[in-house]
Amino acid sequence: NTAGDHIKSEGYKLESRNWPQAVWEKLVYPSKNIKMVLCGHSGETPKMADLNNIDYKPSSSFRIDKAHDGRNVVQMMFNSQQGDGNWNGNGGDCWLRILEFKPDGKSIGVRTFSPLFALSKRTQHMAWRTDDYDQFVITIE
């Protein structure tokens, strides 16, 4: 049995669930101590012209919004589940976001890596994604 089977037979018993906008309005926006939000399972499938020309930008995003007290809240969305262009296959080619918390206490280096591609000499050259939306530094106030 899978979780999906259980929900089909037992129903989804959680009431008053919150969708992303409600999470922002009820939790993140009024909070005095949330500085960063990480999320996934959203966005679009990467655009694939061919195996050597893949645009992963639709499956990730980054933005900074203001909380109720005017401070910045960093938000990063990364949907690795669709990294191979669909919902099945390699489960997104095992893409991970590696966050490196820097000694200054404010900077976080972000890199995108696939251990699946790193395993094979044939695909090692594709193990690190280096576009500006896959490799960047976040500054937390």
Per-segment meaning from a language model:
Residues N1-T2, G40-S42, N79-Q81:
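Active-site metal-binding loops of divalent metal-dependent hydrolases
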Residues T45-E141:
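Binuclear metal-dependent phosphoesterase catalytic core
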Residues K26, M36-C39, W87-N88, F101:
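Compositionally biased, low-complexity repeat tracts
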Residues N1-K35, P46-S59:
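Active-site-proximal segments of metal-dependent phosphoesterases and phosphodiesterases across multiple
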Residues K35-M36, V74:
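Proline-centered loop/turn at the N-terminus of a beta-strand
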